Amino acid sequence: MSETKHTLHTPGWVSDFQKFIMRGNVLDLAVGVVIGAAFSAIVGSAVKDILTPFIGLITGGVDFSNLFITLKGPVKDTLAEAQKAGAVTVNIGVFLNAVIQFLIIAFFIFWLTRILSKLSRKQEAAPAAPPAPTKEEVLLTEIRDLLAQKNS
């Protein structure tokens, strides 16, 4: 039974951790989380700054960010004022913005995975060109052809 000896400077867990981190799926996951966080900020801004005003325009000027119900406390015109006054509120507009953000992210991810899936299927479907024959194969083919000519 062989034993792996580790020096004082490189304990066994360091190499195990390196193997774990260098696995492809761990790196892919880390990249996905970072890109997802950045994309979430972009989508959040798109919903808040671009889509919500249009939806508010269509619905007669309703500002979703200030759509709330006061359960307890002073009734105020805006959510910020109500929260500052200590009112207990149900923030319907904030929830609607989160739902819209989720739907946009889900829609984008759906199309992204669909496109990537089609691209990977096309790459798999394209047959690889056969490798060029080696020198030995060319020589053997020539010998075979010469023997076939000699025997005919």
Swiss-Prot record:
Transmembrane segments: 26-46, 50-70, 92-112
Membrane topology category: Multi-pass membrane protein
Organism ancestry: Bacteria, Pseudomonadati, Pseudomonadota, Alphaproteobacteria, Acetobacterales
Single annotated GO MF: mechanosensitive monoatomic ion channel activity
Record family assignment: Belongs to the MscL family.
Pfam families, A to Z: MscL
Organism: Gluconobacter oxydans (strain 621H) (Gluconobacter suboxydans)
Gene label: mscL
Keywords, in A-Z order: Cell inner membrane, Cell membrane, Ion channel, Ion transport, Membrane, Transmembrane, Transmembrane helix, Transport
Gene Ontology CC, one term: plasma membrane
PANTHER family linked: LARGE-CONDUCTANCE MECHANOSENSITIVE CHANNEL, MECHANOSENSITIVE CHANNEL MSCL
Subunit structure: Homopentamer.
Protein name: Large-conductance mechanosensitive channel
Biological function: Channel that opens in response to stretch forces in the membrane lipid bilayer. May participate in the regulation of osmotic pressure changes within the cell.
Recorded superkingdom: Bacteria
Subcellular location: Cell inner membrane
PROSITE patterns to which the protein is assigned, alphabetical: MSCL (PS01327)
NCBIfam families: mscL, PRK00567.1-4, PRK13952.1
